[in-house]
Amino acid sequence: MKKPTSAPRSKAFGKQRRKTREELNQEARDRKRLKKHRGHAPGSRAAGGNSASGGGNQNQQKDPRIGSKTPVPLGVTEKVTQQHKPKSEKPMLSPQAELDLLETDERLDALLERLEAGETLSAEDQAWVDAKLDRIDELMQKLGLSYDDDDEDDEEDEKQEDMMRLLRGGN
């Protein structure tokens, strides 16, 4: 039993007839007519461009033809040049006032307490503390003060009081 080599063909798949020039022209006109309607709707640029996507939002949109509401000067005016202001330098404090400010500085006190507690400070904080302590030393030297002056004054006062007690009656 041999199978047939080719399947039986119907007449639909047979030779197709050639189209006439008139039919070809008509198909081309139809294709061209379809291509004409591919672009944006007429007037879409003036209408805002988003008419297809935001259908219910059109009442809230601004009209793009309306410009800025800022007033425009109509006459010739001279351009006002602003004078460059030099940065105001910090007012120089007296050494005593600056020393008082440094002694009452909360950040410095907090960092010194942390140092006394044995904590290690960051490099930035340590540099800041060192700079402030150096400034305090400079101011104290300018004012003629030292750390030991207070102790020596107290000791001298105590010695004088002791001498006065001895001279008065030994109480």
Swiss-Prot record:
* Region Disordered, annotated ranges: 1-99, 145-171
Q: Which InterPro entries match?
A: YihI
Give the Basic residues compositional bias ranges. Answer: 31-40
Query: What's in the keyword line of the UniProt record?
Result: GTPase activation, Ribosome biogenesis
Q: Name one GO biological process term.
A: ribosome biogenesis
What are this entry's molecular-function GO terms? GTPase activator activity
Q: Where is the composition biased (Basic and acidic residues)?
A: 20-30
The Acidic residues compositionally biased stretches are 147-160
Q: How does it assemble?
A: Interacts with Der.
Q: Which family does it belong to?
A: Belongs to the YihI family.
What job does the chain carry out? Answer: A GTPase-activating protein (GAP) that modifies Der/EngA GTPase function. May play a role in ribosome biogenesis.
Question: What is the recorded name of this protein?
Answer: Der GTPase-activating protein YihI
Q: Which organism is it from?
A: Salmonella paratyphi C (strain RKS4594)
Specify the taxonomic lineage: Bacteria, Pseudomonadati, Pseudomonadota, Gammaproteobacteria, Enterobacterales
